[in-house]
């Protein structure tokens, strides 16, 4: 069907990734809501798009919702017209918001909304050490140490200086293909 769809994410990098993956223009939530630079007394943002000037679209899809705090969510919800479909995409085990709230986790745990949990991992191979250990850590289990792994490293260091030195070595020598300098 012909629906007007808006795509957004909390960060410019995530919005760019959506655009590249879908071929449709995505933008930051702040840009979509037209942030005007102000902040309300309660700590929320001031947006040009709000209850008095809502987004005129059929569907809003927001990715990386685990990074959305309660103030940004409030601004978004105020700008949604009745009848607009709002779809949140995210992983509760990914980065949380810098601001207050654990919005995505709370939405999922509320039991009020329809939730679709995806089980296929696309960024790593199914049997990768990253995937295996991430699942173990999420379950509160000890991760698997494999000294031959090229993906998952555990390097305990006793002080800040040692951590910084090891990080420098990792970025410059062991993982140069993973870092954008």
PLM region spans:
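Conserved catalytic network of the ASCE P-loop NTPase/AAA+ motor domain
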Residues: 24, 52-54, 78-83, 108-112, ...
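Short, conserved "post-DEAD/DEAH" coupling segment immediately C-terminal to helicase motif II
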Residues: 70-84, 102-107
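Catalytic P-loop NTPase motifs of RecA-like helicase/translocase cores
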Residues: 33, 67-69, 95-96
